[in-house]
Amino acid sequence: MADEGNIISNLNLEDGPVPNGADTSPAIGLISQYVKDLSVENPNAPESYQWAEAPDMAVDFNISARAIQPEIHEIELKINVTSKGAQGTAFIVELAYCGLIGMRNVPDDQAHPFLFAEGPRILFPFARRIIADAVRDAGYPPLMLEPIDFNGLYMQQLAQAQATAEATPAGEA
């Protein structure tokens, strides 16, 4: 009885190793993640703890990426949270959370979506926890941010950029 479809017996080793031991297969990995900047402001404490009205919450975020070395990139996820009521600002939390990503043999058309969609998706739960803890440590109930569809936002911005490029007449860029 032959196991022709068995993963152990069908390793596709016919091609052999790449000359000189070169590894040409694409690889992406998270090297490290860290808080680059964290600011918590509680400008109206302790009076703000007595405010009865529900505050308005504003959450803004931004994503940036830069090459540190040819195969290492830094993704920076900035999240700013402001809680305001009629009586003033309760708290402001500003976080810059980063990840170092190792990328080897990844084409640019695949690296860009990873750096601006998948990478932030990986980092977000950790940033979310830091913000919840910072708000709690400021004396308020922990703030649990809603999940963000980074892939959907990336695709939306890509479509907008393509539409803008198509609307701009040639020679007027």
Swiss-Prot record:
GO terms for cellular component: cytoplasm. Homotetramer, a dimer of dimers. One homotetramer interacts with 1 SecA dimer. Belongs to the SecB family. GO terms for molecular function: unfolded protein binding. This is Protein-export protein SecB. The lineage of its organism: Bacteria, Pseudomonadati, Pseudomonadota, Alphaproteobacteria, Sphingomonadales. GO terms for biological process: protein folding; protein tetramerization; protein transport. Its main location: cytoplasm. One of the proteins required for the normal export of preproteins out of the cell cytoplasm. It is a molecular chaperone that binds to a subset of precursor proteins, maintaining them in a translocation-competent state. It also specifically binds to its receptor SecA. The keyword Chaperone applies. Keywords: Chaperone, Cytoplasm, Protein transport, Translocation, Transport. Transmembrane segments: none annotated.
